Amino acid sequence: MKIPKEGDFITIQSYKHDGNLHRTWRDTMVLKTNENSIIGVNDHTLVTESDDRRWVTREPAIVYFHKKFWFNIIAMIREEGVSYYCNLASPFVLDNEALKYIDYDLDVKVFKDGEKKLLDVEEYERHRRNMHYPKEIDHILKENVKILVDWINNEKGPFSKEYVEIWYNRYHQLKK
């Protein structure tokens, strides 16, 4: 697939390690692309679960995907402030169908007050055993949790004060 341009809409698909489709987001607006990353926005975006349940995102969210890091970041913009949901996941690939990645269950939630919480550890351990995650994947994911926490603590990239404001403003310029 050609690299999407600013203002294009793409589909995002997350898979599980066993190859099963996990979740699909329709019509994510691309805000920026470069050779390693894609920044987009979901705003009342249709999400389809693997069991065909559908729901629509409630608030705008700036999404960040990278080709080298094993996580993606969702900055959820709410009236009371910005919170983050970070998925430990494979680097993304892009094909003619969608931006795709493998979701590895572990998540880091960052609350608007900066508190961090590691989520779904039991689900990760269960899937690691049942889907036979290689030891290399387990090691890579644990190292990427450390990188992610460093980004959070040092307000790097998507966690900087300006990031959400810059990209949310850009979204409003593009949607006119």
Curated annotation (Swiss-Prot):
Family annotation (InterPro entries): DUF402, FomD-like_sf, Ntdp-like, SA1684
Broad class of enzyme this protein falls into: hydrolase
Cofactor(s) demanded: Mg(2+)
Amino acids binding Mg(2+) 1: 87, 103, 107
Catalytic activity, EC: 3.6.1.15, 3.6.1.6
GO terms, molecular function: magnesium ion binding; nucleoside diphosphate phosphatase activity; ribonucleoside triphosphate phosphatase activity
Keywords in alphabetical order: Hydrolase, Magnesium, Metal-binding
Catalyzed reactions: a ribonucleoside 5'-triphosphate + H2O = a ribonucleoside 5'-diphosphate + phosphate + H(+); a ribonucleoside 5'-diphosphate + H2O = a ribonucleoside 5'-phosphate + phosphate + H(+)
SUPFAM superfamilies with a match to the protein in the record: FomD-like
Pfam families referenced in this protein's UniProt entry, alphabetically: DUF402
Catalytic site: 23 (proton donor)
Binding of Mg(2+) 2, residues: 105, 107, 120, 123
Family: Belongs to the Ntdp family.
PANTHER family: PTHR39159, UPF0374 PROTEIN YGAC
HAMAP family in the cross-refs: Ntdp (MF_01568)
Function: Has nucleoside phosphatase activity towards nucleoside triphosphates and nucleoside diphosphates.
Record NCBIfam families: PRK13662.1
Record-given protein name: Nucleoside triphosphate/diphosphate phosphatase
Organism classification: Bacteria, Bacillati, Bacillota, Bacilli, Lactobacillales
